[in-house]
């Protein structure tokens, strides 16, 4: 017999055996059909300049015992935008109203685009979030206090947060680097995109504003993994 164009043979000496084999064939056909469904790609998000603050930094900048105020949830579970804003000061310029993201981190980190870093005269090496060794320095200020950050300024390496299920689906593993293709008027292929796999993640591509501008980013844009 043929099912959706595939020629299959149902084997078995008894009716029950034939029914079991047929059920297996139907399951396999369903799996194949799912694999052949058009992949809509992975949602792309653009991340602007922001800071992650340690508990010590929060208390220095806002006061003893101060707790960050959640404004809205972000795409990754447990991550959120705060009501608080800070000023970033470099040798060549100042950036006001910079977002603070919660919750508190073990170490303070400032994420800028390369354009931002150039504008205020700071070094922002391309690194994964959390890797602040040999990174740039900057001053973080509020109306209450000033923090001189000796290290912690980075340009975040473009990456994909991905669930284990989606990692298996796309045949990628944690810490692997892939290429992604973004379609559109300014379609582009980004290389060296890091894979970060965790059950705690939602599957999303994260670009900074320089990268987002390069591909003509619009809300709802999607990217496909190219190997």
Identify the residue ranges that each predicted region occupies:
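Short, low-complexity, charged amphipathic interaction modules
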Residues: 6, 12-37
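Short amphipathic
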Residues: 40-51
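Acidic, glycine-rich active-site loops and adjacent beta-strand->loop/helix elements
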Residues: 184
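C-terminal edge-of-domain segments
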Residues: 224-227
């Amino acid at each position: 017999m043929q099912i959706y164009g595939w020629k299959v043979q149902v084997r078995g000496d008894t009716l029950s055996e034939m029914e079991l084999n047929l059920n297996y064939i139907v399951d396999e056909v369903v799996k194949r059909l799912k694999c052949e469904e058009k992949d809509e790609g992975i949602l792309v998000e653009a991340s602007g300049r922001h800071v992650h603050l340690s508990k010590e930094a929060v208390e220095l900048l806002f006061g003893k015992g101060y707790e960050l105020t959640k404004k809205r949830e972000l795409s990754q579970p447990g991550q959120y935008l705060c009501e608080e804003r800070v000023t970033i000061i470099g040798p060549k310029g100042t950036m006001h109203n910079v977002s603070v993201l919660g919750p508190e981190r073990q170490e303070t980190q400032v994420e800028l685009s390369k354009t931002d870093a150039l504008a205020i005269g700071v070094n922002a090496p391309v690194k994964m979030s959390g890797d602040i060794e040999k990174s740039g320095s900057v001053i973080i200020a509020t109306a209450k206090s000033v923090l001189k950050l000796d290290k912690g300024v980075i340009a975040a390496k473009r990456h994909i947060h991905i669930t284990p299920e989606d990692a298996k689906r796309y045949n990628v593993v944690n810490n692997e680097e892939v290429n992604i293709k973004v379609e559109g008027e300014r379609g582009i292929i980004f290389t060296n995109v890091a894979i970060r796999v965790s059950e705690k993640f939602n599957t999303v591509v994260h670009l900074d504003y320089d990268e987002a501008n390069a591909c003509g980013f619009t809300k709802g844009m999607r990217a496909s993994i190219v190997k």
